[in-house]
Amino acid sequence: MANSLILGSPINPEGEMMIQFSNNHDNNIEFQRRKKMKKNNPETETDSSSDLSCFVAQTGALLHLPQGFTSSNGSNRECRKSPRPIISSYSSSEKQFVTFTLAPVDGRHCRLRLPMQFTRENGINKPGKIYLVGKDGSKWLANLLLENNRGRMTLGDGWKSFVKANGLKTGDTYTFKLLWEDTTPVLSLCFEEYNTDTRVGEESSKESLPAEPSSQEKIVKDDNNKDESSTWKREGNHLRCKDSTSPSQNCTLTVTITPDSLEHGRLRLPLQFMTENSMNKPGEITLLGTDGAKWMASLLLEKKGRMSLGKGWKDFAKANGLKTGDSITLEPIWEDRTPVLSIKSSSGKGQSEFSKESLSIKPSSGNMTKKVENNREASRKYPPRSRESSSAIQNQFMALTPLRDIVSQVAHDLSIGEVINFRHKGDNMLRVSDLGSNCCGVQDLLAPSSNYDHDNISNISMKINPHIRKEAVTFSSYDGYAHDNFEPPSKKKVKKNNPEMEADYLSDHSCFVSHVTTSSLHTNALSLEVKESLPIEPSIKPNISEDDNNKEEDIIEENSSFEREKNHWICIDSISSSQNRFLTLTITPDSLKHGRLRLPLQFMIENSMNKPGEITVLGKDGAKWLVSLLLERRGRMSLDASSGQETREAEKNREESSSLWELEKRTYCPRKRDSSSDVKNRFLTLTLAPEDVKDGNLHLPCQFMRINGINKPGQITLLGRGGMKWFAYLLSGDGTVVVGNGWKGFCEANGVMLGETFVLEFIPKDDTNHVFKFYTK
């Protein structure tokens, strides 16, 4: 029969619940084994039930605690298993840091697994080498391996040596910081005082704290309703002001440039940052550089829900001098409904220094982007003209190749067909103007129509306001002067052949017109016209009187000479063709084996040789060879050497050929010979080598084969003493002859031993069988 026990639960000062065993007598604390217990005493049960700190239980194999007892004393927590120890942790807010707890397996197997989220967001997805930097700054080279099963990156050889050298112990927690050296990742061990628990503590502080044990049981329902209603109002107000508060709380984002982001043109952005700033929808986004220039980029949504910058990001990074390993701080800005990411600061070796005098564009104005795009679209409407050659004007041009740091400051985004204006400012400085406020007059030509040839393409010439400040060169579309008074040019009818306008325009030597061509963009060089009346010297500056300035400000001309513009086009094309006349190629084994020489398509297009047909190749000795020019499937051009023949007519008229290719270097092959040279070139001296006898081969020099016109494989005849004949086979044009077995006996029969020399005389025959006479020296 089960006994009844009264259990009490006093709480100790430490907050732990203690269970005391007691019978009905208050003085007897110890349990008496052979003492009979009172059965079913209703008074005792009533007294104990009124006191919530004790209860009556039946003694059995298991002791069950009443639910009311546990809930009233705050002991209603469930018992759970202890959580698994964290081996590695990673926080997306600081993706440069990763925390490891060194496990015994890591040291035993000499491997350390990296978190997949850490490697993906930092672009570490390829096996290779990685540097490990210790506390003292020493570097250790380790292998970065890729597991085939799950795509996880691990540290291989070199990790165990790093652990021993830095005294890392099993069970301790260490934090590493990711750095980059060019394209090689670097994991730097942080000092002991750097505690990553501060980052984890912020996240854990968001969790609700457990309620302290309380002895209160009664809670008024009205108070609960009031709390719930106040909570609902507070949540509603939070949702209303979420859009206004989130940008201020998450106003900046620090991103590290990885090699993959520049190679593939993708920059991944944290989804939490983009969501809180309402930029989590794909579309277009504006990137604002440190110089104020705006770049349009694509905002993409990847399969896993992450946001990334796509097309336009790579050009933006190059223009702002961003390199691998640089850290940039981005600030989200909204212009109407267009999202904008502005670079607040950048740090690293790739940081570029921009000019202090470059004018910045306000984020609220999009005039620059719109006007440049309109000019670009208008210029693309006109087809490119055909090239004409004019060698007499080639010396009137010079090539200007801007430096890389200057090009990065240009915000014009020039394209083929656009017109830019330069001004000489003294000290060899040139100024770019793209329909800016410095232009006091714009002159247009008629657009191409059916009555005109493609040579009459519309061109835009600009005249510079003489009141331009004399400062350092700046590349910008706006100079800040009279911006409100400037109006874009309108299309008006043009009067032809206005001599007054020509004289006025040509008299101002401080400006000229240049046209952007295909070759100028490919070669990164722009051809500028140099007139004799404008010597560029550091000491010369344009002297313009006040009367001339007033006249130029008041007069706005709209006409231009059609013939002068046509001659300008001819000059531009002649200099571009002279710049791309040379091509350097490397002879590959495949080109000689298959008889095909591939030529760059860009070079062929710029020289108008992109159509299949025949082409003449001019040798160094003046000999001309007719070769087939082929067009492959992928659009590449190639030379077919199998059809190359020497043309007699081309040899007579060397200067009349339309397309000639001159070879700078080739083997000497005389084509015009007298009788004495003919006889001399028919003899060949060779040495009988052991390997030739063993392999049964005979190698004839390539030059000897070419001079005597032996270019076809077939059977040849060797004539020895007393009319002895030996038949051999010529395999290819490189001079390899298979003489077969018995070649040693043939040489000994003619008095030639191993290591001795002999002479072969080529006897020309009308038939295809070549004959060589064998002599001893």
Curated annotation (Swiss-Prot):
Residues 344-368 have a biased composition (Polar residues). Residues 200-248, 344-391 are annotated as: Disordered. Keywords: DNA-binding, Nucleus, Repeat, Transcription, Transcription regulation. InterPro entries: B3_DNA-bd, DNA-bd_pseudobarrel_sf, REM_fam. Residues 97-193, 252-347, 582-676, 683-777 bind DNA. It is found in: Nucleus. Transmembrane segments: none annotated. PROSITE patterns: B3. It holds the Pfam family B3. The keyword DNA-binding applies. CDD domains: B3_DNA. GO terms for cellular component: nucleus. Residues 218-243, 370-388 have a biased composition (Basic and acidic residues). One of its GO terms (molecular function) is DNA binding. PANTHER family: B3 DOMAIN-CONTAINING PROTEIN REM-LIKE 3-RELATED, B3 DOMAIN-CONTAINING TRANSCRIPTION FACTOR VRN1-LIKE. This is B3 domain-containing protein REM-like 1. The lineage of its organism: Eukaryota, Viridiplantae, Streptophyta, Embryophyta, Tracheophyta.
